[in-house]
UniProtKB/Swiss-Prot annotation:
Disulfide bonds join C113-C192. It is found in: Cell membrane. PROSITE patterns: G_PROTEIN_RECEP_F1_1, G_PROTEIN_RECEP_F1_2. Required in glia to regulate the acute sensitivity to cocaine and to continuously maintain the proper blood-brain barrier (BBB) function. A moody-mediated signaling pathway functions in glia to regulate nervous system insulation and drug-related behaviors. Belongs to the G-protein coupled receptor 1 family. It comes from Drosophila pseudoobscura pseudoobscura (Fruit fly). It is a multi-pass membrane protein. This is G-protein coupled receptor moody.
Length: 675
């Protein structure tokens, strides 16, 4: 080749025209690893925020579960272990991870670079194993209840919790010592993690399968079995409810009387005796309580009692509580899987860190799993919310969580009554008591000139309707009758009805024959109303004599004074706790069985003159009695103001008092009870 040719080629490819490859520098807001500064700042803020919420929430949960015995059960022991693992994760791991995001790299030495991932992966394993243990506990409780008490004893529970911690951290020891993989700094992710050793071995896959995949499969299998058993149980309950005519949610008279003479002369109905309590709440269940009145007079042995279902109601309520905890644990497991799933997918799909934002998001989700559990407890469990209140507001645990215990003015018997399945938020309760005894005629019937009839198939019925929001009225004297509206004069030949309608929104206690109406006091300020025997009545030995208000159930009901009957009672106390009505059932010592009263024939109908006298007496307007509000008496009253005697009515009331020969019980009690 000539020199000209060579020169032309050299001119054609001058150094200035030679193509070169230029490497652009990274942007100013991106570090050498590819993570932007704004992204690292966001990750640091979220990490420190999760750390604060996690430490406060998990510490509050541990203190609340240890302080409040109401929520202290087998599941709570594993939940405490879970909270301790999350607390250690938030207190020991997250501060260093937050500083890593702020500084952009790891600057805390090689020892901490090995220790921090050891604690991190160990706590992750403990958390998932504790969730698996709680799920197994729910599985045994719901599907194999007969084995529950034998498996979950205190020493076995301690062994299970210790096994979770030892297994999770024991699996990390070979990696910590460098025998099977090693803990070191990963420059691509700028974090300390599990690295391959000099032989190329790593424990990531084994730890992932052993501490994550297997517990998840066990949890899924247990919940599948739990849902199957619950579904079958609901199907059986629906079939049983269809056969037994499901109980409606509204109030209705659940207990019926024995054979009673009706006001219009209709044939009486035969219903067995017993006592049933039904609450107007969201529950469709009622509780049957057998009549505990000992030895009713007059054919009481032949009356059958209603079967008791208190034990069934306790079992239903316990199963509902267990199912509520089971759903809460399921929510914890789902949140755990959702939080750990992103980092698992990102590390497998993006090994070369081509999308840094996905890695930051996966780390934040991983840290979020340590603080989300207390939030689930607050949302899904009412008892846990109350337990948190006891710690936050420094309230006694017994007063808030055990409103029917000694801390709130009620007795242990009332707490046992609540365990029968009655709802806490019921607004109205009907209590009907059947007594297998002789029939007690009302005062108005005796005043009309008729004599009480007693047969072996007739029994007194007394019903109480307790309304949680009614005026608290009480008469100041037991000799003053309550105001009653004037009855309408019936047409000629018809039997007059002596049943005055009860005043609206006022607590009443009436006989089933409608012979009288009586207002009862009701107090909301956690006051207990004792009853000395209003559930049964006693017939006077002389059939011709008119029964007194005390013996016929016509007296004034007063706190601490049982003037509505002299017989034995099955319900001894009515306690108001907030808006709840607690009925305390108490066994009484047996009393001798009274002899049956003599059988008497029905008297002939009264002559027309006597009937006209009765009608004139009914048309007479009684004196207006004096009432006072028990809830708001005058404060700091003097002795004379509290004990102003009220004159008794002339005529009938004075005669009744003289015939009894005893002073009024209301006048004996000089002071009204304090609020």
């Amino acid at each position: 080749m000539s020199d000209e040719t060579t020169g032309s080629l050299g001119d054609a490819f001058s150094p200035m025209d030679t193509p070169t490859t230029t490497i652009m520098p990274p942007p100013a807001d991106v570090d050498e690893s590819g993570f932007s500064h704004s992204l690292l700042t966001f990750a640091a803020v979220m990490t420190f925020l999760i750390m604060i919420v996690g430490i406060c929430g998990n510490l509050l949960t541990v203190v609340a579960l240890l302080k409040c015995p109401k929520v202290r059960n087998v599941a709570a022991a594993f939940i405490i272990s879970l909270c301790i693992a999350d607390l250690l994760f938030c207190a020991l791991v997250l501060p260093f991870q937050g500083l890593r995001f702020v500084q952009g790299t790891w600057r805390h030495g090689e020892v901490l670079c090995r220790l921090i991932p050891f604690i991190q992966y160990g706590n992750i394993g403990v958390s998932l194993l504790c969730i698996a243990m709680i799920t197994i506990n729910r599985y045994v409780m719901i599907t194999h209840y007969s084995l529950y008490n034998r498996i979950y004893k205190r020493h076995w529970i301690a062994i299970m919790i210790a096994a979770c911690w030892l297994f999770s951290y024991g699996m990390q020891l070979p990696t910590l010592l460098g025998a099977w993989g090693r803990f070191g700094y990963d420059a691509r992710l700028q974090t300390c993690s599990i690295m391959s050793d000099r032989h190329g071995h790593s424990s990531k896959t084994t730890l992932f399968i052993t501490a994550f995949v297997i517990p998840c499969l066990v949890i899924i299998a247990c919940y599948a079995k739990i849902f199957w058993v619950v579904h079958k149980s609901e199907q059986r309950l629906k079939r049983h409810a269809t056969k037994q005519n499901s109980i409606p949610n509204n109030l209705r008279p659940l207990a019926a009387a024995t054979s009673m003479p009706s006001g219009d002369g209709a044939n009486p109905s035969q219903v067995p005796a017993g006592c049933r309590v039904s609450s107007d709440s969201s529950s469709n269940y009622s509780t049957d309580v057998p009549d505990t009145t000992p030895g009713g007079a007059g054919g009481g042995a032949g009356v059958k009692q209603q079967p008791s279902r208190v034990k069934d109601q306790r079992e239903v309520r316990a199963k509902r509580n267990e199912w509520r905890i089971t759903k809460m644990v399921l929510a914890i497991f789902l949140s755990f899987v959702i939080c750990y799933l992103p980092i698992t997918i990102v590390k497998v799909a993006d090994k070369d860190v081509e999308h840094p934002s996905l890695h930051i998001f996966s780390y934040i989700m991983l840290y979020l799993s340590a603080c989300i559990n207390p939030i689930i407890y607050v949302i899904m469990n009412k008892q846990y919310r109350k337990a948190y209140k006891t710690v936050v507001f420094c309230q006694p645990a017994a007063r808030l969580l055990m409103p029917f215990g000694k801390g709130n003015g009620a007795s242990s018997a009332a707490e046992k009554w609540k365990d029968t399945g009655l709802s806490n938020n019921h607004s109205r309760t009907i209590v009907s008591q059947m007594s297998a005894g002789a029939t007690a005629t009302a005062t108005a019937t005796a005043a009309a000139g008729t004599q009480p009839q007693s047969t072996s198939t007739q029994g007194p019925v007394q019903a109480l309707e307790l309304t949680a929001r009614v005026p608290d009225l009480i008469s100041k004297s037991s000799n003053l009758p309550l105001p009653q509206p004037l009855p309408q004069i019936p047409p000629a030949g018809a039997r007059p009805s002596l049943t005055p309608p009860p005043p609206p929104s006022v607590l009443t206690a009436t006989h089933s024959n409608g012979s009288g109406s009586q207002r009862l006091p009701l107090k909301k300020n956690n006051h207990s109303y004792t009853n000395s025997g209003f559930n049964s009545s006693v017939i006077s030995a002389n059939p011709s004599s008119s029964p007194s208000p005390s013996s016929s159930g016509g007296g004034i009901y007063r706190p601490g004074i049982g003037s509505m009957g002299n017989g034995s009672a099955s319900i001894r106390r009515i306690t108001m706790v907030g808006d709840d009505i607690i009925l305390e059932e108490e066994e009484l010592p047996p009393t001798p069985t009274a002899s049956s009263p003599p059988q008497m024939q029905a008297p002939p109908p009264p002559p027309s003159s006597s009937r006209q006298t009765t009608m004139n007496a009914l048309n007479t307007t009684p004196k207006t009695p004096i009432y006072m509000n028990v809830d708001s008496p005058k404060r700091n009253q003097s002795y004379s103001e509290r004990n102003i005697p009220v004159p008794a009515r002339e005529g009938h009331d004075q005669g009744v008092k003289d015939s009894q020969g005893l002073p009024s019980k209301l006048m004996d009690k000089k002071k009204f009870p304090k609020d």
